[in-house]
Amino acid sequence: MEMRYGKRRDLKQAAALLNECWRWAYKDIFDAAYLESMSDKGRHKKLLKGYKDGKRPLLLFGDAGELLGFCGFGESMTPGYPDDGEISAIYVRENAIGKGYGHALFTRAEKELYAQGYRNLVLDVLSQNERAIAFYLAHGYVKVQDRQFSRGGREYPMDIMRKEAHD
């Protein structure tokens, strides 16, 4: 098993994994047609933009060249939390859930953010994503705000969660 920072050449594989994870993790939240319409090419463009500006590094976790999960993090993009570090994405392949890979990625990203000088960390999560909310609660995050998320022509409730005052 290996954890490392992603490089430009890894972004296509990360984009494909992200779409794969959305399709299984959000199948009861988003419309099937919307999930199937997502393109790896479109995801790749978004990941590439974050990679190019250096504000959204990816930590990758894999085994023998197979990407099992990744975590994106950096400065906060969440309105109202400009001084926080943010975990912007964490996805683990479905058959790798429950093996500690998500925990390893998540805690490493937190450590990196703290090392960059952030005291508080923020993230957002779909309100219906009970598995993720339980994961974040177990890592010390608390819900601090509600917001809406637009995707595929619909609005979805989201929770903003925060972990405060790391010294």
Where are these regions (language model features)?
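C-terminal "cap" of GNAT-fold acetyltransferases
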Residues: 85, 119-133, 138-139, 145-167
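Active-site acidic-Proline motif in GNAT/NAT acetyltransferases
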Residues: 93-95, 99, 127-128
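Acetyl-CoA-dependent GNAT
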Residues: 5-29, 33-95, 103-108, 112, ...
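Short coil/turn segments at alpha/beta junctions that flank glycine-rich nucleotide-binding fingerprints
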Residues: 99, 115-119
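Residues that form or flank phosphate/diphosphate-binding pockets in enzymes
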Residues: 82, 100, 131
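Extreme N-terminal starter segment of soluble prokaryotic enzymes
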Residues: 1-3
